[in-house]
Regions:
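Membrane-embedded segments
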Residues: 43-137
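A substrate-binding/cap region within the structured catalytic cores of diverse enzymes
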Residues: 138-142
């Protein structure tokens, strides 16, 4: 392989790695809809299940996220962990504002994720979420 080919290949790999890294840091909102039937549930229940938000921004004041939830007309919202992030560059207040806005409209239930544990402040985060209106589940069900 020539020196020029090696350099071109190295630049190409570096560019691909950069694009991959940027894609991983870009918070994209993904909405998926599932219909699950159960004989144990007598009336339909609409759930909005949010997970791995990592305190990312979803529009001004989290408008994109809140609008995406509202369109689904949920009966309640489930927060399945990693709502905040252990990275200090991700503003925790953004996650708390999201929870507060959700709780103003729907019942909100939260379970702790690994990133909350990694902060070393699990109990504090749970209390902050409770104060914003979330029901914090710990080894129990709603």
């Amino acid at each position: 392989m020539t020196k020029k080919t090696k350099r071109t290949l190295a630049l190409g790999l570096a560019a691909a790695a950069g694009v991959t890294l940027l894609a991983g840091l870009d918070a994209r909102l993904v909405v998926r809809t599932y219909a699950i039937e159960s004989e144990q549930v007598s009336t339909p229940v609409r759930l909005a299940v949010l997970t791995d938000l990592h305190a990312c921004a979803y529009g001004e004041g989290q408008k994109n996220l809140l609008d995406a939830v509202a369109v689904q007309c949920p009966d309640l919202v489930l927060l399945c962990g990693d709502i905040v992030d252990d990275d200090p560059r991700m503003p925790e207040e953004r996650a708390l504002t999201t929870v507060e806005a959700l709780a103003e409209v729907w019942p909100v239930y939260y379970v702790t994720g690994n990133h909350e544990f990694w902060t070393g402040r699990v109990e504090e985060i749970r209390e902050l979420l409770r104060a914003r209106g979330a029901v914090v589940l710990e080894g129990e069900s709603a």
